[in-house]
């Protein structure tokens, strides 16, 4: 099998988001994949994704409430309505690679002097880009929530900062079986 990978000159951003969603849809159509997992902080990327992926099962994974500020959910009510009205599913849950051990560190960061295993895994995935780490992590989070099957391929979309810049074809698995998750294809990612 031969497939094209698109590399972006810079991470994140609106232009990359449009291209990432377009490339992901094209590959989903080619492979017959009907489930899309997408990361979204405030909901802007999610609102765009449900528009692009009409007729698909779209699972949007958000930050936890309190991620940036106590008792605050960054995903806006306006974007939540757009996503839900278009049939999208919103999952708000703890980051798979940054759990309870983060409470030991300053400002919710890694606890000194050593890193927990989730941090090591996250940093390793970031060697391929922040979007790659995000796409793998949200797929596992969706599997834990029972929103995706572990025996079917999905397209998982992540990004760097704001917007989407990475799309992967992968077979998800649960967090407790994280190393069984399989990245089958890279559709696009930034070159850094």
Name each region found by the language model.
Residues 1-26:
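Glycine-rich phosphate-binding "P-loop"
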Residues 2-6, 56-118:
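Long, charge-dense
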Residues 9, 13, 35-39, 127, ...:
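Glycine- and other small-residue-rich loops at beta-strand/loop junctions that grip anionic moieties
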Residues 87-158, 163:
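Long, charge-patterned amphipathic alpha-helical coiled-coil/hairpin "stalk" segments used as oligomerization
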Residues 152-192:
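Glycine-rich, aromatic-bearing surface loops/beta-hairpins
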């Amino acid at each position: 099998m031969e497939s094209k990978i698109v590399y972006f000159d810079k991470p994140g951003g609106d232009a990359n988001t449009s291209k990432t969603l377009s490339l992901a849809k094209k590959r989903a159509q080619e492979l017959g994949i009907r489930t899309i997992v997408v990361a979204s902080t405030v909901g802007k990327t999610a609102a765009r994704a449900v528009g692009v992926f009409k007729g698909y099962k779209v699972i949007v994974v958000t930050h936890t409430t309190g991620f940036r500020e106590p008792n605050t959910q960054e995903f806006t009510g306006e974007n939540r309505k757009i996503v839900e009205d278009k049939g999208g599913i919103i999952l708000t849950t703890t980051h798979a690679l940054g759990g309870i051990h983060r409470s030991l560190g300053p400002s919710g960061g890694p606890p000194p002097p050593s890193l927990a295993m989730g941090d090591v895994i996250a940093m390793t995935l970031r060697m391929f880009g922040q979007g790659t780490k995000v796409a793998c992590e949200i797929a596992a989070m969706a599997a834990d929530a029972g929103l995706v099957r572990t025996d079917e391929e999905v397209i998982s979309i992540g990004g760097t900062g704001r917007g989407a810049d990475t799309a992967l074809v992968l077979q998800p698995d649960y967090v407790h079986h994280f190393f069984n998750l399989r990245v089958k294809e890279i559709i696009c990612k930034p070159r850094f």
